[in-house]
């Protein structure tokens, strides 16, 4: 069968893992498969900088990408109420520059869709599949309808994060020009469905596939939960050839954010403790990982075939067994790519050194707050002082930590944010959070599934869905991934987080000097330039040993036990209090943590450049309060 897999706007300009893997799976069965990255054509039309704003910077729940295609999909529906909504509710996040961008981008929608239709009609494709995640829905649906009107014999199919569970069923029920919907992972279901179609057999019985009753046109399915592959080593390598061929049309200087690769699926932490705000993995949290040998072979293949320096691991969480297997194997290589991984915050220094030697240059370690009480509400399984310790250790190991401060959790103590705001100046020499924002309510998260129990009320689709989708209210609820809500106790988190948000914004805007320590002769010299001046503190003997003993967050009783015989218990307490007063020591969660960074590591860090995926093309386009984005779904981009 001749198959086209389409990656529409407004997905990021990077190789799409989901459809590229499906291309390899279908190709292995003898089918002729092409991946059409239509997002590249649209980016060329609106300009790469503006497209970057749409795909990477704009708050995803505002659905800017959906707005662009809304009046094509729902002909005659006015989008003026949506623009009014942007102007009133999201004035900070979507400034005037963004609205100017939308007007320009809107003019490119129809030419873009006609170009896409030309691409489809240039070959005799029998099956056209769309990956639809987050803000790709309306663009994909608009093109699918055009294809069906021109070539009704073509089979149209949808998959991706927007098609999980009841979202997929609502999609199929709402748009009759969509023939098939694949819910969840499609490694098994898509090849099975294509084989059945090729043989002229029924799709009934294939789990995770929604098809149409040929007589009634109604939706039919065996189960919305697909069969999931258990041994990831059986998967082929993703085929990114089409992406790089099409990417060559981008203006010189445009960059992609590394080549994506997966070494695992699911979340081993989420199997035990599902972070309350996390909607990743849909309804399946089952953790599966590739063998170290397979992971290494795939990484070698991708690095050499596509001649890339950056590999972005899309795993929800690193398989910690890799610390003793895959990563040491990688460290032995003379040339290693720069890697990004997501992991947990309770890493040890020895583990960070393994990361460093393996070429991991950036991590997202699941730091979402610096207050243990709030972290417990998130079910994160870590503490505030451990998060600060990791930030300092990342600086010393030369690893870039991506992290966030989320607020607005029901039941959180407002004074937690006052305490964090006071500590920002103490941490000014460390890497600031990417964002400080209210958490977003996503489908499948515990806060969504157990909203009443956890203190949320009036849960409804995000306002943008209601303004853009010309569908019945219940159908919109079934389609939505992002939701608005109210608090059962009537709280207003913005009111008690203003000080922290202002402090974080200042932290992000400008450099704040260093806080370092180094051995000079017999002394431990601490140099503090965080406030613009330069202050020095020289420690020797047992006092220096006490400071070094706080390299790991340590309770007072243990410090007295270790240094009391040399300094005296009272003197240990006096020194710690003095260092806390000087802000070179943090007292948090009943433990003491040295804040000064090794001076040699700090010098190396200043010379290093951020990994390419951290670059922002135009800071003037960054919204004041970008929301935290998530991604998921195998049949996704």
Task: Name each model-derived stretch.
Residues 5-6, 13, 21-23, 36-73, ...:
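C-terminal accessory regions of radical SAM enzymes
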Residues 212-264, 522-539, 579-608:
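N-terminal [4Fe-4S]-dependent radical SAM core
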Residues 2, 9-18, 22-42, 90, ...:
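Glycine-rich beta-alpha loop elements in corrinoid/cobalamin-binding modules
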Residues 528-565:
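Short amphipathic alpha-helical interface segments
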Residues 591-637:
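Short, amphipathic alpha-helical interaction segments positioned at domain boundaries
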Residues 2-10, 154-157, 292-402, 407-415, ...:
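Conserved SAM/AdoMet-binding glycine-rich loop
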Residues 253-292:
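Canonical Radical SAM [4Fe-4S] cluster-binding loop centered on the CxxxCxxC motif
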Residues 566-578:
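Short amphipathic alpha-helical interaction segments
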């Amino acid at each position: 069968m001749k198959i086209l897999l389409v990656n529409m706007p407004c997905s990021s300009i990077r190789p799409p893992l989901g459809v590229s893997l499906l291309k390899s799976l279908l190709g292995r069965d003898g089918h002729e498969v092409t991946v059409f990255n239509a997002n590249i054509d649209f980016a060329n039309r609106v300009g790469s900088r503006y497209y970057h704003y749409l795909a990477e910077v704009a708050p995803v729940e505002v659905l800017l990408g959906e707005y662009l295609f809304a009046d094509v999909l729902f002909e005659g529906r006015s989008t003026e109420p949506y623009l009014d909504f942007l102007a009133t509710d999201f004035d900070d996040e979507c400034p005037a520059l963004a609205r100017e961008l939308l007007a320009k981008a809107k003019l490119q929608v129809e030419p873009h869709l006609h170009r896409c239709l030309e691409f489809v009609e240039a070959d005799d494709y029998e099956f056209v599949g769309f990956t639809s995640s987050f803000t790709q829905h309306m663009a994909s649906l608009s093109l699918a309808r055009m294809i069906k009107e021109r070539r009704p014999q073509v089979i149209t199919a949808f998959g991706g994060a927007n098609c999980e569970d009841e979202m997929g069923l609502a999609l199929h029920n709402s748009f009759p020009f969509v023939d098939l919907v694949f819910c969840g992972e499609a490694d098994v279901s898509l090849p099975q469905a294509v084989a059945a179609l090729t043989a002229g057999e029924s799709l009934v019985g294939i789990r995770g596939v929604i098809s149409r009753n040929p007589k009634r046109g109604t939706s039919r399915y065996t189960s919305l939960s697909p069969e999931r592959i258990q041994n990831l080593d059986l998967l082929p390598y993703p085929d990114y050839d089409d992406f790089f061929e099409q990417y060559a049309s981008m203006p010189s200087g445009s960059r992609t954010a590394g080549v994506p690769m997966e070494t695992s699926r699911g979340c081993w932490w989420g199997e035990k403790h599902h972070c309350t705000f996390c909607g990743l993995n849909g309804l399946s949290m089952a953790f599966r990982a590739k063998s170290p040998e397979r992971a290494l072979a795939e990484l070698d293949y991708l690095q050499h075939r596509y001649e890339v320096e950056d590999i972005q691991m899309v795993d929800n969480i690193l398989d910690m067994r890799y610390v003793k297997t895959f990563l040491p194997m990688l460290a032995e290589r003379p040339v290693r790519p720069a890697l990004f991984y997501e992991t947990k915050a309770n890493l040890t220094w020895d583990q960070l050194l393994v990361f460093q030697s393996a070429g991991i240059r950036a991590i997202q370690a699941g730091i979402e707050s610096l207050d243990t009480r709030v972290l417990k509400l998130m079910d994160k399984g870590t503490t505030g002082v451990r998060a600060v310790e990791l930030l300092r250790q990342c600086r010393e190991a030369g690893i870039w930590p991506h992290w966030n401060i989320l607020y607005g959790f029901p039941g959180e103590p407002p004074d937690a944010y006052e305490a964090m705001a006071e500590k920002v100046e103490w941490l000014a020499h460390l890497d600031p959070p990417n964002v400080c924002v209210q958490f977003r309510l996503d489908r499948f998260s515990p806060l969504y599934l157990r909203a009443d129990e956890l203190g949320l009320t009036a849960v409804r689709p995000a306002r943008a869905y209601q303004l853009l989708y010309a569908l019945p209210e219940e159908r919109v609820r079934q389609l939505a991934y992002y939701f608005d809500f109210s608090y059962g106790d009537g709280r207003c988190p913005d009111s008690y987080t203003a000080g922290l948000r202002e402090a974080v914004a200042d932290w992000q805007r400008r450099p704040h000097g260093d806080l370092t320590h180094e051995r000079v002769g017999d002394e431990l010299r601490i140099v503090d330039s965080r406030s613009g001046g330069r202050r020095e503190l020289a420690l020797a003997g047992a006092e220096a040993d006490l400071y070094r003993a706080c390299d790991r967050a340590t309770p007072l009783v243990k410090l007295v036990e270790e240094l009391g015989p040399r300094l005296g218990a009272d003197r240990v307490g006096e020194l710690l209090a003095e260092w806390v007063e000087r802000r070179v020591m943090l007292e948090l969660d009943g433990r003491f943590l040295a804040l000064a960074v090794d001076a040699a590591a700090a010098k190396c860090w200043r010379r290093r450049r951020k990994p390419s995926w951290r670059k922002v093309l135009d800071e003037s386009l960054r919204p004041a309060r970008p929301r935290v984005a998530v991604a998921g779904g195998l049949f996704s981009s």
